[in-house]
Regions:
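Helicase motor core with emphasis on the C-terminal RecA-like subdomain
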Residues: 1-283, 287-294
Length: 294
């Protein structure tokens, strides 16, 4: 959205986009419910004005309010919405959820831990899989798990990598290519590998700690068995006792296909003002026309 708004800030942008035929918005569920999603809505309203025959495609993972997501993307009461078609996959993805829990519950912490007490159990999962993605919720947790795995199991050197947003782009691309070429046994990562990734060799996912949402859990599970009729396998590792309840809830939600809604932003005046200022740097606008456009 940011790059698109910069293009709209350029002089004579209407000439650039006048011949635009289609816009494909990938991973719409990630933008929906954020101010970046509002940026995308505003940019699309401009593109629809500049190109009367514009076609808009939205691609989304499973969310609870898919109809509302379509309405927000295309614009309420718009011709694009009236003439739109919603396509859903009929194939039911098989997802196998397994929990990694300690043998002795008496020593299991109740809060504030990183899950490292179950590191040996995770190594067992890694050894029995072709390639494993180990998802953590923070960069610091990602780095700690990576360091501890190499310290306790130095034989993984050269077969274990780390991937998160603070690592250089060149290194991230190298890791992604190494996964595709099946030269890595495991990758410890964050949400940086949530989206836009198709790694056929990945057999197993490990989620360290609560994923903070069923949709994200399913998204990460789908990184494994990423082919039609293949089974996705994900191991959930609770870092403390309270997350045992979350493990039970996740299994139930996956079984019942219960996914939370992504609530869109309303009345984001700060984003609107920023957008209007962007337009003033290009060719400007008339109040009445921009009101109807938005």
């Amino acid at each position: 959205p940011e790059s698109l708004q910069l293009l709209l800030a350029s002089k004579k942008h209407h000439q650039i986009f006048a011949s635009l035929n289609a816009v494909v918005v990938d991973e719409w569920h990630e933008l929906l419910g954020s101010k970046r999603g509002v940026q995308m809505e505003l940019a699309l309203s401009r593109l629809k004005t500049l190109s009367s025959s514009l076609k808009i495609w939205g691609i989304s993972a499973t969310i609870g309010n898919l109809e509302q997501a379509r309405e927000v993307l295309l614009g309420p009461q718009s011709n694009h919405l009236k003439n739109s078609v919603l396509i859903k996959a009929r194939l039911k993805k098989k997802i196998k959820v397994q929990s990694i829990i300690p043998k002795s519950m008496e020593k299991f912490p109740w809060r504030g831990h990183l899950g490292l007490q179950l590191l040996d159990e995770v190594v067992g999962v890694i050894r029995h899989s072709k390639t494993t993605l180990i998802f953590t919720n923070t960069r610091s947790q990602c780095e700690l798990w990576f360091q501890q795995l190499l310290e306790r199991y130095p034989e993984f050197a050269g077969e274990l990598a780390m991937h998160h947003g603070s690592i250089s782009k060149a290194t991230r691309l190298w890791v992604e290519q190494a996964i595709r070429e099946e030269t890595l046994k495991a990758v410890v990562c964050t949400s940086s590998l949530d989206l836009g990734v198709d790694f056929a060799p990945v057999e197993t996912i490990v989620q360290i700690g609560g994923p903070k949402g069923v949709a994200r859990f399913l998204q990460r599970a789908g990184r494994s068995g990423h082919q039609p009729r293949e089974t996705s396998v994900i191991h959930f590792l609770p870092t403390h006792g309270i997350e045992l309840i979350e493990a039970s809830a996740l299994k139930k939600a996956v079984k019942n296909q219960a996914v939370e809604n992504r609530i869109p932003y309303f009345l984001s005046y700060d984003v609107l003002i920023q957008y209007l200022i962007t337009l003033t740097f290009s060719d400007g606008f008339y109040p009445e026309s921009i009101f109807n456009e938005i």
